Swiss-Prot record:
UniProt keyword annotation of Plastid present: no
Domain HTH myb-type residues, every copy: 27-79, 80-134
GO biological process annotation, one example: positive regulation of DNA-templated transcription
Protein's recorded name: Transcription factor MYB83
DNA-binding region location: 55-79, 107-130
Disruption phenotype: No visible phenotype under normal growth conditions, but the double mutant plants myb48 and myb83 nearly lack secondary wall thickening, stop growing after developing one to two pairs of small leaves and subsequently die.
Basic and acidic residues composition-biased segments: 1-16
Biological function: Transcription factor that acts as a molecular switch in the NAC012/SND1-mediated transcriptional network regulating secondary wall biosynthesis. Is directly activated by NAC012/SND1 and its close homologs, including NAC043/NST1, NAC066/NST2, NAC101/VND6 and NAC030/VND7. Is required for functional expression of a number of secondary wall-associated transcription factors and secondary wall biosynthetic genes involved in cellulose, xylan and lignin synthesis. Functions redundantly with MYB46 in the transcriptional regulatory cascade leading to secondary wall formation in fibers and vessels.
Region called Disordered, residue ranges: 1-33, 134-172
Tissue specificity of this protein: Expressed specifically in fiber and vessel cells that are undergoing secondary wall thickening in floral stems. Expressed in vessels but not in xylary fibers in the developing secondary xylem of roots.
């Protein structure tokens, strides 16, 4: 006896209701898509009368063939009376930046903190405007942070300039031009052995920072000790008129011609002045040198007398003074013409 296979169509349609046999077909079909003005008026009238509640009940009670979600979105995004229109204010933009840095892309939570704005509106405004502005600002900050390094790279080469302690920048090439004539004097300076002089008031106006005592003059430690166009620098008592440009017979001050003044270190020998000019005839005051010329017009080597070697003027602490008078007089007995007045 053969078994018949069951009909596949019968099994497939077994669980479905038979509409022809009086099945439940009374459920209305909901609408989708755009809202009509009539639907908007029904929803507004019901919401202003009854307020918010369950959106599925609102759709049914308002006589709308819409689902609850569609009614909620239509009311919140378009129909509520407190809805703001137009562009965002600068205060709202700052608040969106702040809330987005905390909440991220949680637009519904951000919208609850901006009255009158919807989450969809805030999201669209962020993606279209604020996100690009934030990216541009970050790029500008990155470029501005790298610009100081570029400006520092354009600064002058330290081999071409040096800066003294006073903040003045001078060129090394100018110093090299004065290398050979650094110790020259405008005219010959001669000292009369019969004229006494005082060491104390030797320097009255040198343009230095401080003058502690008559026997010591401290010069700022800036490598090259330059004092510019200085006239009537040294005041020497008892010296007569020894030249038109060396000694002033009225004020008894030593004035030299030239642009730059340099003071070498002189701790063992009394040296009056040095300047840049054409002729050089520098004489020491110590009689043990017998008024010997220390330099000539082209090159010189002063050695221990001035603390200079091969025309180099890079000195640490140049001074005029700090003599031990007792030891100096004991070692040099031939000082009858020098009258040192010490207070």
């Amino acid at each position: 006896m053969m078994m018949r296979k069951p009909d596949i169509t019968t099994i497939r349609d077994k669980g479905k209701p038979n509409h022809a046999c009086g099945g439940n077909n009374n459920k209305p079909k909901l609408r989708k898509g755009l809202w009509s003005p009539d639907e908007d008026e029904k929803l507004i009238r019901y919401m202003l009368t009854n307020g918010q509640g369950c959106w599925s009940d609102i759709a049914r009670n308002a006589g709308l063939l819409r689902c609850g979600k569609s009614c909620r979105l239509r009311w919140i995004n378009y129909l509520r009376p407190d809805l703001k229109r137009g562009s965002f204010s600068p205060q709202e933009e700052d608040l969106i930046f702040h809330l987005h840095s905390i909440l991220g892309n949680r637009w519904s939570q951000i919208a609850t903190r901006l009255p009158g704005r919807t989450d969809n509106e805030i999201k669209n405004f962020w993606n279209s405007t604020l996100k690009k502005r934030l990216k541009n600002n970050s790029n500008n900050n990155t470029s501005s942070g790298s610009s100081p390094n570029n400006s520092n790279s354009n600064s002058l080469d330290p081999r071409d300039q040096h800066v003294d302690m006073g903040g003045n920048s001078t060129s090394l090439m100018d110093d090299y031009h004065h290398d050979e004539n650094m110790m020259t004097v405008g005219n010959t300076m001669r000292m009369d052995s019969s004229s006494p002089f005082n060491v104390g008031p030797m320097v009255n106006s040198v343009g230095l920072n401080q003058l502690y005592d008559p026997l010591m003059i401290s010069v700022p430690d800036n490598g090259y000790h330059q004092m510019g166009n200085t006239v009537n620098v040294f005041s020497v008592n008892g010296l007569g008129d020894y030249g038109n440009t060396i000694l002033d017979p009225i004020s008894k001050r030593v004035s030299v011609e030239g642009d730059d003044w340099f003071i070498p270190p002189s701790e063992n020998t009394n040296v009056i002045a040095c300047s840049t000019s054409n002729n050089l005839n520098l004489q020491a005051l110590d009689p043990c040198f017998n008024s010997k010329n220390l330099c000539h017009s082209e090159s010189f080597k002063v050695g221990n007398v001035l603390g200079i070697e091969n025309g180099s003027w890079e000195i640490e602490n140049p001074k005029i003074g700090d003599w031990d008078l007792d030891g100096l007089i004991d070692n040099n007995s031939s000082f009858p013409f020098l009258d040192f007045q010490v207070d």
